Regions:
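Hydrophobic alpha-helical segments that form the core
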Residues: 271-281
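An alpha-helical support segment within catalytic cores of ATP-dependent transferases
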Residues: 9-29, 128, 132-204, 214, ...
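Conserved catalytic motifs of the protein kinase core domain
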Residues: 51, 97, 197-199, 218
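Active-site Asp-x-Gly
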Residues: 199-201, 207-209, 213-268
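ATP-binding pocket architecture of kinase catalytic cores
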Residues: 32-153
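The feature marks helicase ATPase cores and/or their adjacent C-terminal helical subdomains
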Residues: 36, 199-200, 274, 290-294, ...
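Glycine-rich, phosphate-binding/catalytic loops in enzymes
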Residues: 72-73, 118-119, 237-241, 301
Length: 321
């Protein structure tokens, strides 16, 4: 996935396309178009129009139509159960380039808002609602698409889409984890194969950067649903949502979700296993680019040496050496 190039010529071209899209959908051109740098694969424009304020996202990648379609399905589903999210008005193509029109959301990214504990408590509450939406099949392709490439079982997802064994081999190849640690993670994941898992909707990246709040710290929208998936919950959701939080914020999220602390303790090994294994792509990228600094930092992080709240296996092994 290549980020959009910040070239004036390309921006002017996509601004003209955005104007055509808006005029096509609303019958008259916008009064103002402002380019919004996204740093991702889309060209994003804020639109002022007599019909309201909108956002147009245009991708140079033809396959992005599926991601936009998925986002429309997910936002409609969660809005039905009271989760604030952007209203997607249209998904289409202009030539080979997909686009999506949404109603503009008011507010700003939650990351630096002073009421973080309040916000994260609400994030937990909304996560529970999102995870209560039952789905069929496992992985990125589920109810939103008629694509027949779906995983009917949890084991299918682990082996085919998530590519569990290959991911584990990354940690061995780059000496991120000991064979004992890898065996332990493998057992945790393999034990889930015999569980009766009812898949449900997971946002897949429910972090501050994907939460929009107003001045009072009230959530106005949860955004970026492209990575949502049908999978086990709440373990998968928590493995990502808790990743960047302080210990107090973790507690607030869990409280907002309504989880019993004993239940969290029971789920903890699986949450940690998901979190660790999802580092495999980052480790591979660092190795491919010969980023030795990042590799060393990943190795330190995955050893548990930065965990100040429990004695990890690695720490106990060093203590007994």
């Amino acid at each position: 996935m290549v980020e959009t190039q910040e070239q004036p010529g390309a921006i002017r071209r996509y601004r003209r396309i955005a104007r055509r899209i808006i005029e096509h959908h609303f019958g008259q051109p916008p009064s103002r178009i402002v380019y919004k740098r996204s740093g991702r694969t889309n060209y994003v424009f804020a639109i002022n129009h007599v019909e309201g304020q909108f956002v147009v996202r245009i991708s140079p990648e033809p396959e992005k139509t599926e991601a936009f379609t998925k986002e429309r399905w997910a936002t409609q589903k969660v809005r039905e159960v009271g989760v604030p999210s952007p209203e997607v008005l249209a998904v289409g193509n202009i030539g080979s380039e997909p686009y999506m029109i949404t109603r503009r959301v008011t507010g700003s990214e939650a990351t630096h808002h002073p009421r973080r504990n309040h916000i994260v408590h609400e994030m937990g509450r909304y996560a529970q609602i999102i995870n209560s939406i039952r789905t069929t099949n496992f992985g990125a392709n589920f109810d939103w698409t008629t694509n027949e490439s779906k995983n009917a079982t949890w084991s299918d997802y682990l082996d085919k889409e998530w590519d569990f064994q290959r991911r584990l081999s990354v940690f061995s190849k780059h000496e991120m984890l000991s064979s004992h640690q890898i065996d332990g993670i493998k057992k945790i994941i393999d034990d889930t194969r015999t569980m009766r898992i009812q898949p449900s909707l997971n946002h897949g990246d429910l972090r501050f950067k994907n939460v929009i709040v107003d001045d009072d710290g009230e959530i106005t929208a949860i955004v970026d649903w492209e990575e949502c998936l049908s999978t086990i919950a709440p373990e998968w959701e928590l493995s990502i949502a808790l990743h960047d939080l302080t210990i107090d914020e973790k507690n607030s999220f869990i409280e907002g979700y309504g989880l019993d602390l004993t239940h969290v303790e029971t789920m903890s090994p699986l949450i940690k296993a998901f979190n660790i294994i999802n580092y495999s792509n980052a480790v591979e990228h660092a190795a491919a680019t010969e980023d030795h600094k990042s590799l060393a930092e990943f190795r330190l992080r995955l050893s548990g040496s930065l965990d100040l709240y429990s004695l990890t296996n690695a720490a106990r092994e060093r203590a007994s050496a």
